[in-house]
A protein has these predicted regions:
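Short S/T/G/P-rich N-terminal loop/turn motif that feeds into the first structured element of a domain
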Residues: 1-50, 56-70, 77-96
């Protein structure tokens, strides 16, 4: 499995997460199209928030980045949020 964490902070981050919460059904529908999606979480932080996506492989994780980027460009470009800091890697432990 491969995980991607997108951390949004700074200019526009709180507004972006307000919009993501308001449009969570749309966000969920778009991410469910990602091949090999295992899980997705959206978390608020003091200065914005982060998303954690786990996919069966790196190809799915890469597609999740594209889906997120495209959604923000289409539906949240007016917010002008700073780009996320992206961290990704192979999952070594999973607890269910």
């Amino acid at each position: 499995m491969h995980a991607v964490v997108r951390n949004y902070s700074g200019a526009g981050a709180k507004q972006l997460f307000d919009l993501l919460e308001q449009r969570k059904g749309d966000v969920e529908a778009n991410l469910r199209k990602v091949p090999g999606l295992v899980s997705y979480m959206l978390l608020r932080s003091d200065d914005g928030g982060m998303s954690v996506t786990v996919c069966k492989d790196k190809a799915g994780a890469d597609e999740s980045l594209k889906v997120a980027r495209d959604w923000i460009q289409k539906d949240a470009s007016n917010i002008h949020a700073n780009p996320p800091v992206v961290t990704e890697g192979s999952v070594i432990v999973e607890i269910k």
